[in-house]
């Protein structure tokens, strides 16, 4: 359950309460793309694993991963205002002990591959950044992407291949989330770089 503190029920047993202060639109948890990611995240074996949230915004997904007992969560955001909102939400949820918050870009993730990587971005950004984002999980790891529409789905899937394979697709209205799993390194082609991969703000130095 994602809500501001004044909307939480007195008894939160049986739910995962994520407190979010409504701010300047960096994610309140009520958009279909966030809901899809939350659905996908809660059925993954997160406990004891390392999670990275790329483009964390208000940190709803990162906080949820922490409350699902992830061993550690790295939240990455390249917008200073969004980063401020995310840090505030992490503090109010009391999950700072397992969190690392970095203001930067997706290149930061490469230094520490994660068991599960979350990327709720736009369809265009996912397409342009696919090869870099898909290499963030460790071999055999999980990548959950959202923010794409049904019209963008085939382009995003094509851009992610052959580094990952789609394990599950979730839909809400016109929005899509993909649960994809990374191939082991020995199953990858020698080179998967393409012209135009490094075209998004997430791939440029902050």
Positions of PLM-derived features:
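Structural motif
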Residues: 1, 17-18, 50, 72, ...
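Conserved SAM/SAH cofactor-binding pocket of Class I
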Residues: 24, 28-106, 110
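Short, solvent-exposed coil/turn segments
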Residues: 13, 60, 173-175
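S-adenosylmethionine
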Residues: 44, 78-206
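Generic structural signal for well-ordered alpha-helical scaffold segments
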Residues: 7, 38-42, 134
């Amino acid at each position: 359950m994602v809500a501001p503190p004044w909307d939480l029920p007195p008894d939160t047993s049986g739910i995962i309460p994520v407190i979010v202060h409504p701010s300047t639109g960096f994610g309140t948890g009520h958009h279909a793309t966030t809901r899809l990611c939350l659905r996908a995240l809660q059925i993954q074996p997160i406990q004891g694993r390392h999670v990275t949230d790329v483009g964390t915004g208000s940190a709803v997904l990162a906080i949820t991963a922490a409350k699902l007992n992830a061993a550690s969560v790295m939240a990455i955001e390249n917008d200073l205002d969004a980063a401020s909102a995310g840090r505030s939400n992490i503090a109010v949820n009391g999950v700072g002990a397992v969190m690392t918050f970095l203001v930067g870009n997706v290149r930061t993730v490469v230094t520490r591959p994660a068991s599960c990587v979350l990327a709720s971005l736009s369809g265009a950004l996912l397409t342009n950044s696919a090869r870099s984002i898909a290499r963030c999980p460790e071999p055999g790891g999980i990548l959950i992407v959202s923010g794409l529409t049904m019209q963008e789905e085939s382009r995003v899937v094509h851009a992610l291949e052959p580094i990952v394979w789609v394990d599950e697709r979730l839909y809400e209205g016109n929005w899509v989330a993909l649960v994809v799993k990374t191939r082991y390194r020995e199953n990858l082609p020698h080179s998967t770089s393409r012209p135009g991969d490094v075209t998004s703000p997430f791939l440029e130095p902050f």
